[in-house]
């Protein structure tokens, strides 16, 4: 007897048994089996028939079906070939009218350079917990068209993503995400709605894209790559003053102190006290002095 609608615990286990799936921790495979949780995520994302949604790590299709239920198109990026091959069949069986609105991309999300088809408008995903931050930043970098999103991540990671300057947990993820977007925590998800049950709680983060800081008045030579190099250096040792943390980029702490002061920032401040706008101003001063090249990690 065929089933329709969203997945439940029984259908999750049935599909897993059919394809011989044994969830692995290395790929962060924990599948949501609670329809109320799925609909809650979709409701928070506020997507509908006008949207084309990126979903990273669709797994067995719980959230995919919830997104398709709204009338949205879904581009599902899945690294596991067995899961990627199964997903269209699951959608065709449980939500036949939505099958044509699903596109599956078999790939590691970090290897994706372009999202196929029409421009996406949103990112909604239960991100693999072991790579959640790099995947989120990568999707923001390669696809500037999407403007809103909701992601489910480990609770501790959710706290770090939304942390403000001055917080003990404010760091590289918080600062880099703030370059692209405003992020707020919008909910908690208990372990009991997953199979297998993880040993951590989960959190929901809503993302609203915005223009990078100082876009209008910024020196055009300043790039995201440069800003992220300074972010990495500023947080490499939380106890270091900024002049010491950036000494390697500036040719010494004295030169760093002069350049940081020129940016209107206290060189004795620590990275954890600075927002992304402050760090962008530091980069601008460094770039104007020729202290930075345009190389470095995104």
Swiss-Prot record:
Keywords: Cytoplasm, Methyltransferase, RNA-binding, rRNA processing, S-adenosyl-L-methionine, Transferase. Coiled coil: none annotated. PROSITE patterns: RRNA_A_DIMETH, SAM_RNA_A_N6_MT. It comes from the Bacteria. It is found in: Cytoplasm. Its EC number is 2.1.1.182. This is Ribosomal RNA small subunit methyltransferase A.
């Amino acid at each position: 007897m065929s089933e329709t609608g969203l997945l439940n615990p029984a259908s999750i286990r049935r599909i897993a048994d059919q394809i011989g799936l044994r969830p692995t921790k290395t790929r962060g495979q924990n599948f949501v089996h609670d329809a109320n949780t799925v609909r809650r995520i979709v409701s928070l994302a506020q997507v509908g028939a006008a949207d084309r949604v990126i979903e990273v790590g669709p797994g067995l299709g719980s959230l995919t079906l919830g997104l398709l239920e709204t009338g949205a198109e879904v581009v599902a990026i899945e690294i596991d070939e067995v899961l990627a091959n199964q997903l269209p069949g699951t959608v065709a069986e449980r939500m036949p009218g939505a099958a044509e609105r699903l596109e599956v991309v078999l790939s590691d999300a970090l290897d994706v350079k372009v999202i196929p088809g029409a421009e996406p408008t949103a990112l909604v995903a239960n991100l693999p917990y072991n790579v959640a931050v790099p995947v989120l930043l990568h999707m923001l970098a390669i696809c500037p068209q999407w403007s809103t999103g909701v992601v489910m991540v480990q609770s501790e990671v959710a706290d770090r993503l939304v942390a403000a300057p001055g917080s003990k947990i404010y760091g590289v993820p918080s600062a880099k995400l703030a370059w692209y977007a405003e992020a707020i925590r919008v909910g908690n998800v208990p372990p009991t709605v997953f199979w297998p049950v993880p040993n951590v709680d989960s959190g929901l983060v809503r993302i609203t894209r915005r223009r990078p800081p100082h876009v209008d008045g910024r020196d055009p030579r300043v790039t995201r790559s440069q800003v992220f190099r300074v972010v990495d250096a500023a947080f490499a040792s939380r106890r270091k003053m900024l002049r010491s943390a950036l000494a390697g980029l500036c040719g010494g702490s004295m030169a760093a102190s002069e350049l940081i002061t020129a940016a209107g920032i206290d060189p004795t401040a620590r990275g954890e006290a600075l927002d992304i706008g402050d760090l962008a101003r530091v980069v601008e001063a460094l770039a104007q002095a020729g202290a930075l090249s345009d190389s470095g990690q995104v």
